[in-house]
């Protein structure tokens, strides 16, 4: 009984230490590669990547630092896309197709992955961005 109370107390402490952290997870089709996306304090987008329960990429921040150009951005808010984000939505989907290359050693190529699409809003600049994570059995890719 004491163990259960300690576990509940530890869980409550961890929840208080990480307010509003909503992590989204997507696995590769075979389940070995696991990508986790989260917004850390200050609305900074981050991700981690594990392979067979071992970290491959530790927590890494995402974002774009924009060039300051007074002529190209007349009167625009030049806030970088590094922090201050809120997650507005997310969805997970699966893609699986086989295609035939024009030439090469392989007759067919399978393109099979699970995708996490995260929609973010930066209220200070009124910008919206979408980050897509494609998780394959042998790795991952991302794009803005």
Spans of model-derived segments:
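N-terminal accessory beta-strand-rich subdomains and adjacent acidic, glycine-rich linkers
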Residues: 25-143
């Amino acid at each position: 009984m004491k163990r259960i109370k300690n576990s509940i107390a530890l869980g409550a402490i961890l929840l208080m230490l990480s307010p509003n952290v909503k992590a989204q997870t997507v696995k590769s089709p075979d389940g070995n590669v696991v990508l986790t996306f989260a917004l850390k304090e200050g609305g900074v987008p981050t991700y981690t990547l594990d392979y067979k329960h071992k970290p491959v990429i530790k927590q890494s921040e995402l974002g774009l630092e924009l060039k300051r150009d007074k002529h190209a951005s007349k009167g625009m808010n030049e806030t970088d896309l590094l922090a201050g984000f809120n997650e507005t939505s997310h969805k997970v989907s699966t893609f699986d197709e086989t295609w035939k290359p024009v030439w090469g050693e392989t007759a067919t190529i399978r393109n099979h992955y699970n995708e996490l699409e995260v929609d973010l809003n930066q209220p200070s600049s009124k910008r919206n961005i979408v980050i897509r994570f494609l998780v394959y059995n042998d790795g991952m890719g991302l794009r803005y």
